[in-house]
């Protein structure tokens, strides 16, 4: 039986068709989604898929590649979008190579901040034709060359703050003809080259936190006629004659153009004062002011100028997807949160991430409105730039702040320097809550009540230099949470309590130089971001790293000079810390005071091994100063000393603060010292030589004795000289007197030894008691040939003696009056002569040579006296005849050893030996060249005693 299929109902058919349609729709949606994603990825590029998130808004793509650890740009690819912002901050880029951005033609904003970029090679920015903003902040750039920014012809905003730039070449910005905003704050610029901004239409320039001392008008300021905002704070301005042109130029521009203050750093007499409050006479007191005045022409109108509000209301530049528009206000320099360095001037971030509008334009003004209320003893003016009242009460002999009547209404700046204020009370500043600057320098403040500044919550600068403050405590700075600059130099501070600076977390500059500090408590700088610290001229011997130095992580300047640093093991940690500082951070040298081997030496030039032989075991953190007891101050400080506005003594005058000596004066002083040293050395040399010669002369004089010369009556030996060629006079005992014979200088009678004085009974010829032996001690050194009677008789048999006449007594020598006293008072009494001898023949030497006795046996008074025939001459030693003309002397003394005494009249025949010896031919006397004295033998019947006394000869002591 045939059965039929059940019929399909209409309902089922509709259900089937609907199911099929849903499947097709789902498949189409999935396919469309896949195709859309693929198209999107292909449209933005690989950089948005793998490396960085991308966001499109208002037709601009923002590519966020921040903090991705990117080392090289080759790790990413350019996005495929017409206009985009590329954010590469917080990476590890250290160098930009040529043509690295050649494919990034769509970039309008490029963030390269917070990298480690040290160099930008020529052509690195080629391809960035559409770039309008470039951020290079927080890198390590040191130089901006002429070709650094080639290819950035459309650049309008350039930020290169927080680098180490010290040199900018003259044409570095020459091709940036559209540049309007230039941020160069917090670098190491000490000057700007001429014509740097000649072709740059700058409207905003930030030069804060550099090392600028001058800004010349010619070549620099004259090209900045379009500037509407200028920031020059935190530079060491030298308020001298050269700054008059800057003062004139600032007076000629809009009142609102200068944001902040130009505060004088030098000279010391103007330290801490605003340039607009210093007169030209104070800037240039001794020169013609007109030579330095360079007034630019006043702009006709301010049309097109964009005026800004003060720095306190400026916004921070941040990354944004908004398109850059010229009418919008450019942002200020930024700082990444992970960077320790901060802005010197506080800047409040804007609520939105875009650009804030410029403030409304104001009419060009050159005079400030008249202030409403001002204390009677002070002068006041209103500053339009910050809408604050400046109260100037300097040098008004004010003894108390309460004397200021009427009270100024909400002053912005108060100058109370050079007064007699001794105490700061808690009620002194109750009505000054808006105070931004308070200058109490160079007063007599020794006491500040606790929380005296508690109401000054907006105070940024506080000057307490040049007072008598001895101790710092946390209560002293209570309420100063906005304080950025604190000047405490030239006080008597000996102690800083722990936590003193906790109430001032925003402190950036701290001057503690020229105090009596010897230690710093642990954690004293905890929580601070100090940029500049001055500890010069204190009593520090070392500073611990742990708890003190290691907390100074944001420093851009520190001064440790002129402290008695003890360069031993305790300072090794500080040395290592100093060596890790970047170039330019340490202001001056760190000179060792002890130990002596390192004195006046820079600590950095000494190896750690020399400072501490076992420095590897030394802990980097030296003992904390809390354990060091601060002794009483060693130097007395006179309370009546007046200090000038810098805190230095007022007696120093304009240049009193300069401790260095001018180079010309130093060179002249060194030259004078050198010349004096030469003269002193020459004088000492001459003195030493004279003393040496005197000592030698004294030694010679002690070995000399005076011997009197005398004339002896004698007869000339016969013969005319014999065959020997040497004439010997033959003595005749009878016959006519012969004329005087002139003997040579070496005749024996000119050589009279000292003991001849004993032939006379005059006491002047006697030897002094106790020196009878010493007088003849050196006789053997003369080596004079002598012979006894016994030897002569053996050599030649004398002729039979003639009849001897009656012997005449020996002649008595007479002294001139005063001769005895003269001999007693002087050792050198007669011209000095040298005695030369010739070695005698060995067969003529006497066997009786003795150092303790004088010549013996020379002329023995024997009984066998004989005469020598006429014409017969002895070969060497002629014997004296026993004639009346010959004298035989019998000594009346006995020559003994040193322990014996002389006794006249001794009976021993040995003692009757005469002291006169026969003349050896080898003995002669040579007079000195300075004196000439020829002794002549005279043939007289009686001796000439006056001539005997005049002709004296000095011989070496025997």
UniProtKB/Swiss-Prot annotation:
**UniProt KW keywords:** Glycoprotein, Leucine-rich repeat, Membrane, Repeat, Signal, Transmembrane, Transmembrane helix
Q: Which residues cross the membrane?
A: 665-685
Gene Ontology, cellular component aspect: glutamatergic synapse; plasma membrane; postsynaptic density membrane; receptor complex
Annotated function: Suppresses neurite outgrowth.
- Topological region Cytoplasmic: 686-958
Query: Where do the LRR repeats start and stop?
Result: 82-103, 106-127, 130-151, 154-175, 178-199, 201-222, 410-431, 434-455, 458-479, 482-503, 506-527, 529-550
The record's family statement is: Belongs to the SLITRK family.
Segment Disordered: which positions?
317-358, 789-844
The record ties this protein, via InterPro entries, to: Cys-rich_flank_reg_C, Leu-rich_rpt, Leu-rich_rpt_typical-subtyp, LRR_dom_sf
Report, as the record phrases it, the tissue specificity of this protein. Answer: Expressed predominantly in the cerebral cortex of the brain but also at low levels in the spinal cord and medulla.
Q: Where does the record place Pro residues bias?
A: 797-812
Q: Which GO terms describe its biological process?
A: adult behavior; axonogenesis; chemical synaptic transmission; circulatory system development; dendrite morphogenesis; grooming behavior; positive regulation of synapse assembly; regulation of trans-synaptic signaling by BDNF, modulating synaptic transmission
Which N-terminal stretch is annotated as signal sequence?
A: 1-40
Q: Where in the cell is it found?
A: Membrane
Q: How does it sit in the membrane?
A: Single-pass type I membrane protein
What are the residue boundaries of the LRRNT domain, all occurrences included?
365-407
Alphabetical list of Pfam families matching this protein: LRR_8
Q: Which organism is it from?
A: Homo sapiens
Is Protein biosynthesis given among the entry's keywords? no
Residues with glycosylation annotation: 103, 644
| Residue intervals of the LRRCT domain | 235-286, 563-614
Q: Which domain of life is it from?
A: Eukaryota
Task: Name the SUPFAM superfamilies on file.
Answer: L domain-like
Full protein name: SLIT and NTRK-like protein 5
The residues exposed to the Extracellular compartment are 41-664
The encoding gene = SLITRK5
């Amino acid at each position: 039986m045939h059965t039929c299929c059940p019929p399909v109902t209409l309902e089922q058919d509709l259900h089937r068709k609907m199911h099929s349609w849903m499947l097709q729709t789902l498949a189409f949606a999935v396919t469309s989604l896949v195709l859309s994603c693929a198209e999107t990825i292909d449209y933005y590029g690989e950089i948005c898929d793998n490396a960085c998130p991308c966001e499109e808004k208002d037709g601009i793509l923002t590519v966020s590649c921040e903090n991705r650890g990117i080392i090289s740009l080759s790790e990413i690819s350019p996005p495929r979008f017409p206009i985009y912002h590329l954010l590469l901050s917080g990476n590890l880029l250290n160098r930009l190579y040529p043509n690295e951005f050649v494919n990034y033609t769509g970039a309008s904003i490029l963030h390269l901040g917070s990298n480690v970029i040290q160099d930008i090679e020529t052509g690195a920015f080629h391809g960035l034709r559409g770039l309008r903003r470039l951020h290079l902040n927080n890198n390590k750039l040191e130089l901006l060359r002429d070709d650094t920014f080639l290819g950035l012809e459309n650049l309008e905003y350039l930020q290169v703050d927080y680098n180490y730039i010290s040199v900018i070449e003259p044409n570095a910005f020459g091709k940036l003809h559209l540049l309007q905003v230039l941020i160069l704050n917090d670098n190491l610029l000490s000057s700007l080259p001429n014509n740097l901004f000649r072709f740059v239409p700058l409207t905003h320039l930030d030069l804060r936190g550099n090392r600028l001392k001058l800004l010349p008008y010619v070549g620099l300021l004259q090209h900045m006629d379009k500037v509407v905002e200028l920031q020059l704070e935190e530079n060491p301005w030298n308020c001298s004659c050269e700054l008059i042109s800057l003062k004139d130029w600032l007076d000629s521009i809009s009142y609102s153009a200068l944001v902040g203050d130009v505060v004088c750093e030098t000279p010391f007499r103007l330290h801490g004062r605003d340039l607009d409050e210093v007169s030209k006479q104070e800037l240039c007191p001794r020169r013609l002011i007109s030579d330095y005045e360079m007034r630019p022409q006043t702009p006709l109108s301010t049309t097109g100028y964009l005026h800004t509000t003060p720095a306190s209301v400026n916004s921070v530049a941040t990354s944004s997807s908004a398109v850059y528009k010229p009418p919008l206000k450019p942002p200020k320099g930024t700082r990444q949160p992970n960077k320790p360095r901060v802005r010197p001037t506080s800047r409040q971030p804007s609520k939105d991430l875009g650009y804030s509008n410029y403030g409304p334009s104001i009419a060009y003004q050159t005079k400030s409105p008249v202030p409403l209320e001002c204390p009677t003893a002070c002068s006041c003016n209103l500053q339009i730039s910050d809408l604050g009242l400046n109260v100037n009460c300097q040098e008004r002999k004010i003894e108390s702040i309460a004397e200021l009547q009427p009270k100024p209404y909400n002053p912005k700046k108060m100058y109370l320097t050079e007064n007699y204020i001794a105490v700061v009370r808690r009620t002194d500043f109750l009505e000054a809550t808006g105070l931004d600057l308070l200058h109490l320098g160079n007063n007599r403040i020794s006491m500040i009540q606790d929380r005296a500044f508690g109401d000054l919550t907006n105070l940024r600068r506080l000057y307490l230099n040049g007072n008598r403050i001895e101790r710092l405590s946390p209560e002293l700075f209570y309420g100063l949470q906005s304080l950025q600059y604190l000047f405490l130099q030239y006080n008597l501070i000996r102690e800083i309590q722990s936590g003193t600076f906790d109430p001032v977390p925003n402190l950036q500059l701290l001057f503690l130089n020229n105090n009596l500090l010897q230690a710093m408590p642990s954690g004293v700088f905890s929580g601070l971001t100090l940029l500049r610290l001055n500890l010069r001229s204190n009593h520090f011997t070392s500073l611990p790293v742990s708890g003190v130095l290691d907390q100074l992580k944001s420093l851009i300047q520190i001064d440790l000079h002129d402290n008695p640093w003890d360069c031993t093991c305790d300072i090794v940690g500080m040395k290592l810390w100093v060596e890790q500082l970047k170039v330019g951070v340490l202001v001056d040298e760190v000179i060792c005071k002890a130990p002596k081997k390192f004195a006046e030496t820079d600590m950095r030039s000494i190896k750690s091994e020399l400072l501490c032989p076992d420095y590897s075991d030394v802990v980097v953190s030296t003992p904390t100063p809390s354990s060091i007891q601060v002794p009483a101050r060693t130097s007395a400080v006179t309370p009546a000393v007046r200090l000038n506005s810098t805190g230095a003594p007022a007696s120093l005058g304009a240049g009193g603060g300069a401790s260095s000596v001018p180079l010309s004066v130093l060179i002249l002083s060194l030259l004078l010292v050198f010349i004096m040293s030469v003269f002193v050395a020459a004088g000492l040399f001459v003195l030493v030589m004279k003393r040496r010669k005197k000592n030698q002369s004294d030694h010679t004089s002690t070995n000399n004795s005076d011997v009197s010369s005398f004339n002896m009556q004698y007869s000339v030996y016969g013969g005319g000289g014999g065959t020997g060629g040497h004439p010997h006079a033959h003595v005749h005992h009878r016959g006519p007197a012969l004329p005087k014979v002139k003997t040579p200088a070496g005749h024996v009678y000119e050589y009279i030894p000292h003991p001849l004085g004993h032939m006379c009974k005059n006491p002047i010829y006697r030897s002094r008691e106790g020196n009878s032996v010493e007088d003849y001690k050196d006789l053997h050194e003369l080596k004079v040939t002598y012979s006894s009677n016994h030897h002569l008789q053996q050599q030649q048999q004398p002729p039979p003696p003639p009849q001897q006449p009656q012997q005449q007594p020996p002649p008595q020598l007479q002294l001139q009056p005063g001769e005895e006293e003269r001999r007693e008072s002087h050792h050198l009494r007669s011209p000095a002569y040298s005695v030369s001898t010739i070695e005698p023949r060995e067969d003529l030497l006497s066997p009786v040579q003795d150092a303790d006795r004088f010549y013996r046996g020379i002329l023995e008074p024997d009984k066998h006296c004989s005469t020598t025939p006429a014409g017969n001459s002895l070969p060497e030693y002629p014997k004296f005849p026993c004639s009346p003309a010959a004298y035989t002397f019998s000594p009346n003394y006995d020559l003994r050893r040193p322990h014996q005494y002389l006794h006249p009249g001794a009976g021993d025949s040995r003692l009757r030996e005469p002291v006169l010896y026969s003349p050896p031919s080898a003995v002669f006397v040579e007079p000195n060249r300075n004196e000439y004295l020829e002794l002549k033998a005279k043939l007289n019947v009686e001796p000439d005693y006056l001539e005997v006394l005049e002709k004296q000869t000095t011989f070496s002591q025997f």
